[in-house]
Amino acid sequence: MNMGKIDATVFTEVEKLMAFFKLRGLKPVLLANKRRTITLNGSAPRDLYDYLDEHFPELTIFTRLRDPKIPFKKTKAATEYVLSEMGWESNEVVYIGSSHDDMITALHGSILFLRATWYSNKTDYGFEFSEPKEVARFIDTLCLREHFWSHEIIDGDFEYYALAPFSTSPYKPTFAKYSHNARAAAKFGQGDVDFWLGALVTSMYFTGIHKRIDFIAAYPGHSEGVDNDKMCGDLMTFGKCFNKGYLHDLIERHKTAIKSQTARINKIPIDHHNQLNTIKLNKLPTKNYKTVYKKAPVKKGKTVLLVDDICTAGWSLDAGRKYIEKTGAKTILVTWLKTINTNYCSIGGMGNFDPYEANTFAGIPMDKQYGYHEYHVDGVASEELGDHLELYLDWDWPA
């Protein structure tokens, strides 16, 4: 909540947000430390929380001013207390706030932080929203999905997830209506990048993947270099919400890889060696673009979330997986989409090699194939995603 005079225009939007919560059956909770007052139409100041109780009867307020058993905001105990009282798990909740204290509270509670900048903008943590309507759209179109992954492969330490199938074929209209947008977003920064990264982030959050990782990395593009400029910002923001480092330079493309389209046009045969022989790891990567590690962080006992946009046969992701696993660390692999009717093909034994050096492999065998149809576990996910993309593009306050 803000201090001082309330902006009537903004408060009207907040009222719409509260009405939206009620309409969707969502329970709002306010966690507060400080005493605050409100002055209406020249009347004497009155307790803000009493006013909010009257104005928003569906709102539950937790504050030490009313109950000394409630722990101080910012402490881990504060969110634990609220979650326990409400009967919620942390990844069933989002935290809307704007202050540094809000950020710390969300971080200590392992809760996804939505940064409301319409009152103030005092931290660079969290996903930024400039007005209540943006928050409502995010919740309505991304958080309230019921089908978070269309593809799931879990085989021992091997884990892979995808939001939905990928196809731009006119014969697959259910897939095509979102696949064109996704490809434009992933390859050219067009389409609706915010929707796709929002879908990825919420799927990972609400299925608890963030609880099982230590670091996040994006698989680099085909050109020499590191990182993925379409995803880096949101992946780092997601990681910072839970104190998971984003390692933009963990995987380096030391030599340009041939694109599949270029290979097809020029009739150049390529396989998984096109990826294995063009990447290497950085032993001392950079955390959140600021801090260079002095000791190798990716090692036994750690797990890296490795993210790519569109997966065809899995050669790129699996090359990254094999290099990371050579350090002793584990991986969880996630992509926006999975190409239809194409199996995920894992890479076989690579012998002894240095993952931090450029390598030239030959004759590396393929390992298991994970059938497309067998691991397409939720056919409704694609329909829901397409419908929610359309809703996202045209969203307005419910009538």
Where on the chain are the PLM-derived regions?
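Active-site neighborhood of HAD-like aspartate-dependent phosphohydrolases
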Residues: 1-27
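PRPP/pyrophosphate-binding module of the type I phosphoribosyltransferase fold
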Residues: 3-4, 114, 263-362
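Substrate-recognition element of Asp-dependent hydrolases with the DxDx(T/V) motif
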Residues: 17-70
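A short, structured active-site edge motif that brings together acidic residues
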Residues: 57-74, 218-219, 244-258
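Conserved Lys-Pro-Asp/Glu-containing loop-to-beta segment of HAD-superfamily phosphomonoesterases
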Residues: 78-101, 302-308
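Acidic, Mg2+-coordinating phosphoryl-transfer loop and its flanking beta/alpha structural elements
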Residues: 95-130
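PRPP-dependent phosphoribosyltransferase catalytic core
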Residues: 132-173, 318-399
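Active-site-facing substrate-recognition patch
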Residues: 140-215, 224-225, 229, 258-300, ...
